Regions:
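Surface-exposed, charged secondary-structure patches
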Residues: 332, 453-499, 504-506
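Bacterial N-terminal signal peptides that target proteins for export
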Residues: 1-7
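Short, surface-exposed loop or secondary-structure junction motifs
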Residues: 80-85, 138-358
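Short, conserved catalytic-motif segment at the N-terminal edge
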Residues: 37-99, 119-121, 132-136, 173, ...
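Boundary at the C-terminal end of the N-terminal hydrophobic targeting segment
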Residues: 19-24
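Bacterial N-terminal signal peptides
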Residues: 7-16
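Short, gly/Ser/Thr-rich active-site loops of penicillin-recognizing serine hydrolases
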Residues: 315-324, 350, 378-450, 515-516
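Short, well-ordered beta-strand elements
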Residues: 354-355, 365-368, 372-381, 491-493, ...
């Protein structure tokens, strides 16, 4: 299978000095509601469709379908071409596609759900649940036992197996058992390197079956697909009503040749799911709903904290040094494999998480942007269609051109309090006897009298003080605010301690002249 700093607007508050400071105008806060973001995206959806259609034509795809999810809603879909060339049946948004390795995160979610139920541990040796693997000795005597987590993160040491693994999809449980009992080969020492392995995810399927006491397909259907309302998602293409599935093709010269459609089998856990765009959008919405962390009652098939575990960088898997933004500016990114998902961070600080899928006859990709609250999904019925590239461009259109915002960071009460206290210290508004907001290290790191002189000099350069902005949080214990004066502004960055009553451990100031 082929895989592939928050900014919150400042509310400006006025304060009284010897003469009353004027209020500055307060910019509007970010409206992160689904309706507001739908309105931002709407004028660019025609460009999104044009991007997908251009890709489909350039790649000569038989057919394709794509969609945009914002929070819990599939807000836009588009289609291209044919699901069945002989019947000239067009692709619709309800057409079933095999999504290949996009299935892996379902398998990972099932493993983590069993972990949450106390039925397995991620550090369990795989051989505890798949005794047939005990026939394979470790690479070296000091190699750790291959664990469930090694399988999840593609670090078991098995060789990359895309061409071979893609043809194993329909092998029987008995054939798979015999294969394992004969022993398997390693390409690298367990736990030391990333290498993409379909075998690893087939083993995870076998673990689910053993631990749950029912086939992994049924466990995932019962615990994930059914609760999400994914009624048109199945493991075996034979379960799709006649005429409802996109047939897979490969290209030979100018011709499209049909690819055989493999039935479900022991390797399905690595890439066997068949689904529709609306069904998969429900799954994408579940992952989006894991963000931000909050106190709400749990309502998803998998705990929100567990989903966020899946979304973390676990095993470094790539560095794209030459990537560029839509405007052509350098925008390198790094990627890591998590639990059934690929985590990616670019030089703007934008995080995207998702997975590609590729099989003989099919190619697909999805990614979601947890800080922006949207997802991009696309399926095609051409062998290894590689829709990751177009999904990347569409994500960039929605962020860079449309301007979909990042989710604002909520200002913690202590951060707001300390910002006001620091401002009072800097502009000498602190009453005698008021406790300092500084931690015990602060005036060990800075000579008190020299720091006071330097701070006074900077504040005096502002001229008449007009306002202090609300703090712009980086997180609950770190942020920036500005002291605004007639001759410029003073940007103040500060970080609080991990104490029960957090105090200021670090503070940096930067003067910005008016008109500079």
């Amino acid at each position: 299978m082929k895989s592939a700093p928050f900014v919150a607007l400042a509310f400006v508050i006025s304060f009284a000095t010897t003469t009353k400071a004027a209020e500055t105008s307060s910019p509007n806060p970010v409206d992160f509601s689904p309706a507001a973001r739908r309105a931002i995206a709407a004028p660019y959806l025609a460009e999104v469709d044009a991007e997908f259609r251009r890709f489909a034509e350039e790649k000569r795809l038989p057919g394709a379908v794509w969609g945009i999810v914002i929070d819990a809603e599939l807000v836009h879909t588009g289609t291209f071409g044919l699901a069945d060339l002989d019947r000239r049946a067009p692709v619709t948004k309800e057409t079933r596609f095999r999504i290949a390795s996009m299935s892996k995160s379902f398998t990972a979610a099932a493993i983590l759900r069993l972990r949450d139920e106390g039925r397995l541990h991620l550090q369990d040796p795989v051989a505890k649940h798949v005794p047939e693997l005990a026939a394979t000795p470790p690479v070296t005597r000091d190699t750790p036992p291959t664990s469930i987590e090694h399988l999840l993160t593609m670090s078991a040491g098995f060789p990359e197996d895309n061409p071979w693994g893609d043809r194993q999809l329909d092998v029987t449980d008995e054939t798979f058992r015999d294969f394992l009992a004969a022993g398997v080969s390693f390409a690298s020492t367990t736990g030391t390197a990333y290498e993409y392995s379909n075998l690893g995810y087939a083993l995870l399927g076998r673990i689910i079956t053993r631990v749950a006491g029912l086939p992994y397909q049924e466990y995932i259907r019962r615990e994930l697909l059914a609760p999400l309302g994914m009624k048109d998602t199945v493991w075996d293409p034979r379960d799709v009503p006649a005429g409802k599935i996109a047939l897979g093709y490969q290209r030979e010269g100018a011709a499209w040749l049909p690819e055989p459609l493999l039935n479900d089998g022991a390797y399905g856990a690595m890439g066997g799911l068949v689904t529709t765009l609306p069904d998969f959008a429900r799954y994408a919405a579940m992952h989006l709903a894991a963000w931000p962390p909050r106190d709400d009652v749990e309502s998803l098939p998998v705990r929100r904290a567990t989903l966020r575990e899946m979304h973390q960088a676990r095993m470094p898997s790539g560095f794209a040094a030459t990537e560029k933004s839509l405007a052509g500016e350098p925008q390198p990114n790094v990627s890591s494999y998590g639990y059934g998902l690929v985590w990616n961070l670019d030089s703007r600080g934008t995080v995207r998480i998702g997975h590609s899928g590729g099989l003989p006859g099919y190619g697909s990709n999805w990614r979601f942007y947890p800080d922006h609250g949207f997802a991009v999904i696309s399926f095609a019925n051409l062998r290894y269609a590689g829709t990751s590239a177009v999904n990347t461009r569409v994500g960039a259109i929605l962020i860079e051109k449309a301007g979909l915002p990042r989710r604002p960071v909520i200002v913690s009460p202590i951060l707001q309090q300390r910002s006001r206290e620091v401002a009072d210290v800097l502009i000498r508004r602190t009453a005698a006897g008021t406790p300092e907001p500084f931690a015990m290290n602060f005036f060990l790191d800075h000579d008190r009298e020299r720091w006071r002189r330097e701070a006074d000099d900077l504040v005096q350069m502002l001229g008449k003080i007009e306002a202090v902005s609300n703090v712009q949080p980086v997180n609950a214990l770190r942020g920036t605010f500005q002291i605004l004066g007639e001759k410029g502004s003073l940007e103040v960055f500060f970080t609080l301690t991990p104490e029960r009553n957090p105090l200021v451990q670090e503070l940096k100031m930067k003067l910005r002249r008016a008109g500079g």
